[in-house]
Amino acid sequence: MKFTEHEMVFFNSITKGNDVFGIPLKFRTQKSHEEEVKKTINGLIEKGVLASETELTKMGFLPARALECYKESRNHIIINYLHIALLEQREAIVIIPLKNREYEMLRLPRVAVLYLLLKIYPVLQTGTVSEKELLQLQDIDSFLREVKDCKENIMIGEFQDNALTKEWLYYWKNNQIFEYDLNRQIKREVGAV
């Protein structure tokens, strides 16, 4: 389901915890604060999420609980602008920032996240499978020079307990897919999915 930034701030305010990992939500007022709050509440009532100013509907409980699970998760992955919280029940909460400060929030089985990635990045379905894996040390400066003209790069950050544990980038060059581990400064050619 899609929500405005103000609606996400509302859900954040009624769930446990303060911050939504990786997503800087703010209540940005264009008019008076009271008018914006009223507009936000009316929008949630129109979507069937709120029954009144103080009561969630059954349909409203689902996104509120999804955001709460996202906030409680200890394991997060950020792939470009895709924010993923891995849950213990082989599920994931995915929050996708859209245009105009809107967000789409999905609760999916983890395997569906792979399908979503293949749908968003069809280039993952192409490429060659190398017979030998060759690891190559490459300093960050030469890597940045190499990747500056590459398009459709995928940046991945893996987080545990809100701390970055691993960071790497997939990029395409000369019809080949490469992975660069930013922590270890190692480049390798990878095969297609």
Pin down the residues of each PLM region.
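Alpha-helix boundary/N-cap detector
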Residues: K31-E35, K39
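A broad, low-specificity signal for short, low-complexity segments enriched in glycine/proline
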Residues: N12-I14, E53-K58
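A short, conserved structural fragment
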Residues: I41, I45-E55
